[in-house]
């Protein structure tokens, strides 16, 4: 899921400029505000939902993160193939909410599987892996942009997110909310 996160941070202004035929100065501001505002909303929603759900179901955090990932799938498709202002900006808002919901639950889910003795290391490895993924996807989408296929690249990220969602739901089966 780091791939679409980095893709939006690094390439969404270009996608907005191309798909909406607006200057990059407007596209950069529009994409930054869209993602930042909606991600903040997603973090608040995702954190609140997860904290309540885990009290009733130990997999509540996993399910909350999965809901967030699920929201990013149609938004990536619409970001990639949309050409109207409402479609593209709406998809950006939906992506931000979904990503915020997912992101708010990364550390809480990690706490369900990794002892407090190793959490900083585990989170550091997770972040480092995400940064490497970000470098990879930025380079790849840059090449796709040069070939005129940035939108297709965004849409294809939906496939990767779907696979990550399936893996998360199948394999993440916590036994506690806080591994000691």
Language model: regions and residue ranges:
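Conserved glycine-rich helix-kink/hinge and helix-boundary motifs of the Major Facilitator Superfamily
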Residues: 28-29, 66, 120, 124
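A late C-terminal transmembrane helix in Major Facilitator Superfamily
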Residues: 43, 111-147
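Cytoplasmic membrane-interface "Motif A"-like loop-to-helix N-cap segments
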Residues: 51-68
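A membrane-interface helix-boundary motif in multi-pass transporters
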Residues: 23, 60-63, 140-160
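Multi-pass alpha-helical transporter architecture, strongest
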Residues: 75, 79-81, 155-180
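Interfacial helix-cap and linker-helix signal at transmembrane-aqueous boundaries
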Residues: 16-17, 49-50, 54, 141-149
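Extracytoplasmic gate region of multi-pass secondary transporters
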Residues: 1-44, 103, 107, 138
């Amino acid at each position: 899921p780091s791939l679409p996160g980095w893709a939006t941070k690094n390439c969404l202004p270009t996608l907005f400029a191309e798909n909406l035929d607006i200057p990059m100065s407007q596209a950069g501001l529009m994409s930054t505000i869209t993602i930042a505002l909606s991600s903040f909303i997603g973090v608040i929603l995702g954190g609140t939902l997860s904290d309540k759900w885990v009290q009733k179901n130990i997999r509540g955090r996993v399910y909350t993160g999965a809901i967030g990932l699920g929201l990013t799938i149609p938004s990536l498709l619409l970001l990639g193939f949309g050409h109207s202002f409402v479609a593209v900006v709406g998809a950006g808002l939906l992506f931000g909410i979904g990503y915020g919901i997912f992101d708010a639950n990364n550390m809480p889910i990690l706490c369900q599987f990794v002892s407090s003795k190793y959490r900083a290391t585990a989170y550091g490895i997770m972040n480092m892996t995400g940064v490497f993924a970000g470098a990879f996807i930025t380079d790849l989408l840059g090449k796709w942009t040069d070939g005129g296929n940035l939108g297709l690249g965004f849409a294809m990220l939906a496939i990767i997110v779907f696979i990550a969602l399936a893996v998360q739901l199948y394999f993440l089966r916590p036994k506690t909310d806080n591994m000691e």
